């Protein structure tokens, strides 16, 4: 499946947004990929996650568990796990730190893949992988639908994606004036209380 076919699914779902966005990383961008818009369509999400599951199998072989960070990774992780026939669990932020809740556990040396919706800087992925390691899981890789860094994000393990996209981002101190003229939207879930 080509990257253009992947992007077409996101466009069909109305998931490629334009405006002034503050990303979970704190960076500013004129474009945002709202993966939840894709995940609201079961046929599209199943199709995309089936393709991602194939890439995971080709790259990493057999795994035991899919682990995702809430919120964005929950549906993607579940659907990928369904395609692979393995369980899926997720970490939730409690006072800014990832924690396992809801009776979830990771048995020692369980072969895990961390699955996200979108990777930009890799911060959420690294935090989730660190949390898996603290629970004695064996993280053998990571996967996402879209890699916004075009391979530039370091998540600490090999990362596979369905598509890579470079979308320019700006530090708060370096926002272009044309972008500053647009009202800010904060669509991510990192700082929700």
Residue ranges and their predicted role:
Residues 1-193:
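PRPP-associated nucleotide enzymes
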């Amino acid at each position: 499946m080509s990257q253009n076919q992947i992007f077409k699914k996101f466009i069909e779902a109305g998931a490629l947004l334009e405006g002034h966005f503050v990303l979970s990383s704190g960076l500013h961008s004129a474009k945002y990929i709202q993966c939840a818009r894709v995940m609201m369509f079961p046929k599209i999400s199943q199709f995309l996650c089936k393709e991602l599951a194939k890439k995971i199998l080709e790259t990493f072989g057999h795994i035991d568990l899919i682990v995702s960070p809430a919120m964005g990774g929950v549906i993607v992780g579940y659907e990928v796990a369904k395609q692979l026939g393995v369980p899926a669990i997720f970490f939730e932020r409690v006072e800014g730190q990832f924690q396992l809740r809801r009776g979830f556990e990771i048995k020692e040396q369980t072969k895990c893949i961390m699955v996200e919706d979108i990777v930009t800087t890799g911060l959420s992925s690294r935090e989730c992988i660190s949390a898996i390691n603290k629970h004695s899981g064996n993280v053998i890789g990571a996967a996402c639908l879209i890699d916004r860094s075009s391979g530039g994000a370091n998540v600490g393990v090999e990362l596979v994606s369905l598509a890579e996209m470079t979308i320019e981002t700006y530090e708060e101190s370096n926002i272009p004036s044309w972008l500053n003229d647009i009202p800010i939207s904060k669509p991510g879930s990192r700082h929700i209380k």
